[in-house]
């Protein structure tokens, strides 16, 4: 479910040493399964453990997860990264905004999941997003760009070299992707 790297465990162990005995950590998702989902980590003293919490044991600590957050934390990773600028705790939870779909789910659901969990987080760095409008009978995924992608001069490259390659690699049953956006260049456009 959740992977906590050794560096992160050491970081948490130092913090927990200054807390009430028996205190562990809680990993949670606020607004799970929505575009506004946010992940967090907090202290979890013994009296804050709920009966339906899932306890995950690690070498240096335990983490508690509530039953609502649990499915949205599949494949999550907590790391403690140090570089020239300092150190920081990172929590990556690719399924926080959308629950992972089964491998045998309908193609449209699997494509939508990859767009929301893998593609859109990358586009969000430029203020953009892409939505799946439909999958045609011929096997084309019809997409619509929004935000900073609308009118961006790099949108064709992003569509063909980024999104299409990723989707065709994951879903051989697709024949390609098409953009149905009426692009209008403006201040909102990234490039």
Curated annotation (Swiss-Prot):
Keywords tagged on the record: 4Fe-4S, Iron, Iron-sulfur, Metal-binding
Domain of life: Bacteria
Species, as recorded: Edwardsiella ictaluri (strain 93-146)
Protein name per the record: Fe/S biogenesis protein NfuA
Disulfide feature: none
InterPro entries cross-referenced by the UniProt entry: Fe/S_biogenesis_protein_NfuA (IPR017726), FeS_biogenesis (IPR000361), FSCA_dom_sf (IPR034904), HesB-like_dom_sf (IPR035903), NIF_FeS_clus_asmbl_NifU_C (IPR001075)
Keyword Ribosomal protein: no
GO MF, one annotated term: 4 iron, 4 sulfur cluster binding
Family: Belongs to the NfuA family.
Note accompanying the cofactor annotation: Binds 1 [4Fe-4S] cluster per subunit. The cluster is presumably bound at the interface of two monomers.
Quaternary structure and interacting proteins, as annotated: Homodimer.
Binding-site list for [4Fe-4S] cluster: 149, 152
Known role: Involved in iron-sulfur cluster biogenesis. Binds a 4Fe-4S cluster, can transfer this cluster to apoproteins, and thereby intervenes in the maturation of Fe/S proteins. Could also act as a scaffold/chaperone for damaged Fe/S proteins.
Cofactor(s) recorded in Swiss-Prot or TrEMBL: [4Fe-4S] cluster
Pfam families: Fe-S_biosyn, NifU
GO BP: any one term: protein maturation
């Amino acid at each position: 479910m959740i992977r906590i790297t050794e560096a992160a465990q050491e970081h948490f162990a130092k913090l927990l040493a200054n807390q009430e005995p028996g205190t562990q950590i809680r990993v949670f998702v606020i607004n799970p399964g929505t575009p506004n989902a946010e992940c967090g980590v907090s202290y979890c003293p013994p009296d804050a453990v709920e009966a339906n919490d899932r306890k995950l044991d690690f070498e240096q600590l335990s983490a508690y997860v509530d039953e609502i957050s649990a499915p949205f934390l599949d494949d999550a990773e907590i790391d403690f990264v140090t570089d020239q600028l300092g150190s920081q705790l990172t929590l990556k939870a690719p399924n926080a905004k959308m629950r992972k779909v089964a491998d045998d789910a309908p193609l449209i659901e699997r494509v939508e999941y990859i767009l929301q969990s893998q593609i859109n987080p990358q586009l969000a760095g430029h203020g953009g997003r892409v939505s799946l409008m439909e999958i045609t009978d011929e096997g084309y995924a019809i997409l619509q760009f929004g935000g900073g992608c609308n009118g961006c001069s790099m949108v064709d490259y992003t569509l063909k070299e980024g999104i299409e390659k990723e989707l065709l690699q994951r879903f051989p049953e697709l024949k390609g992707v098409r953009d149905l956006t009426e692009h209008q260049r403006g201040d909102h456009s990234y490039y």
